[in-house]
């Protein structure tokens, strides 16, 4: 008689559950994505079997730490910041619903409201549809982001990693959520805070940071947002590069020699790249770049003026979030 073999049914998916003491048990529905520090999955609360959006959540599972007494510092920083952000209570800042340190699996779970798409994906899908993305819609999105940043900055928090993927969007409610606060920094001074920036995406970092400045201004977030707004209206990453020297070159292509624009800064990074130190000619110009690639039609030059103030090379002269919200682009009708 032939040996009996155990039958397996690969088409039957094993359900996965996550238990939180305060808010109950959640069932995994699908994966959303994975990044450097972990993955995000879509879950639903099994207490309610309806399919309403209010029952759907996003669960961030932070990667396992190697030693039993070691917890990922980035995630602990994010938990700390999320508690502060919940206190701030701005409608455009992502708040956590529940959190848990799972000692058994050596993971950190952060439960948040579910938002179906990020700004990069939404604009990539709809940028050429003028009936969906026009100046009025774009202006509303920009104002929401500035409102969130203004609340952070007034509470002495610098996000430090503003990019399209970290701004989620709900098309049904037309509301954004700034998320991913793992790199955020709190500062105790009204002007700046000295610390090491260990993360962030090069393409969205200002030249003063790329040149080695350790003083983090709130203007870091404003530069990043300026880059984001240009990307959303053009479909192009304006300062795309493989490393920080590439990004500095792209910045010089637009603005001209940084050694002239930031004479008081340590230009060690410039000395490492001959292409940067030899540049003498003026840049192509920010407004010229936007007008060349823009896919959103603007009624006047107000938007160009705002992003020019946001992408001011000197961080001290860069517009702040509160003043940006009062800019004439938001006041004028479009």
Model-derived features: positions:
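Conserved activation segment of eukaryotic-like protein kinases, specifically the C-terminal portion
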Residues: 194-209
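Activation segment signature within eukaryotic-like protein kinase domains
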Residues: 141-142
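Catalytic-loop of the protein kinase fold
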Residues: 153-169
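Conserved HxN/HPN-centered segment at the entrance to the catalytic loop
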Residues: 87-98
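Glycine-rich ATP phosphate-binding loop
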Residues: 39-65
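C-terminal lobe substrate-recognition/regulatory segment of protein kinase catalytic domains
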Residues: 257-306
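Conserved N-lobe beta3->alphaC-helix segment of eukaryotic protein kinase catalytic domains
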Residues: 56, 61-88
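Conserved short submotifs of the Hanks-type protein kinase catalytic core
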Residues: 105-118
